[in-house]
Amino acid sequence: MKELLIIGIGGFIGAILRYVISGIIPAKFGIPTGTFIVNLIGSFIVGFVMYSSTVIDISPEYRLLIITGFCGALTTFSTFSYETFSLIENNEHIKFLTNIFINVMGCLIMIYVGRIMSLTILR
């Protein structure tokens, strides 16, 4: 029960932040920029926390709060999928491919950046 409350608190904060970021960042070049930004932020945080936990002790409760709760609500693959599918439905083939590429590559890069920053700061 304690774990569910911890996840819920993180999820509450992550969901609100996602709503705010998605609402204030308009689409650029026909690409859903808000979703892209929250996915980059979430990927960085996951990379940072997961690699930090290899150097310092991060309690399971904090990992649940940050990764499962906060990042789980902040980032969203379902919204990314819907928005990407909408681009292909509207025959926006270049935007469709661009959206997939920048989201996947951007998030992989942010995992790496989070890892590097974590290992640099904590050593």
From Swiss-Prot:
This protein's UniProt keywords: Cell membrane, Ion channel, Ion transport, Membrane, Metal-binding, Sodium, Transmembrane, Transmembrane helix, Transport
UniProt activity-regulation remark: Na(+) is not transported, but it plays an essential structural role and its presence is essential for fluoride channel function.
Keyword Aminoacyl-tRNA synthetase: no
Positions of Na(+) binding: G72, T75
Spans through the membrane: 5-25, 29-49, 65-85, 94-114
Gene Ontology BP annotations: cellular detoxification of fluoride
Gene Ontology cellular-component terms listed: plasma membrane
Topology of this chain in the membrane: Multi-pass membrane protein
Swiss-Prot/TrEMBL catalytic activity: fluoride(in) = fluoride(out)
Main location: membrane
Listed Pfam families: CRCB
GO MF: fluoride channel activity; metal ion binding
Subcellular location field: Cell membrane
Family: Belongs to the fluoride channel Fluc/FEX (TC 1.A.43) family.
Biological role: Fluoride-specific ion channel. Important for reducing fluoride concentration in the cell, thus reducing its toxicity.
Name the record gives this protein: Fluoride-specific ion channel FluC
Originating species: Methanococcus aeolicus (strain ATCC BAA-1280 / DSM 17508 / OCM 812 / Nankai-3)
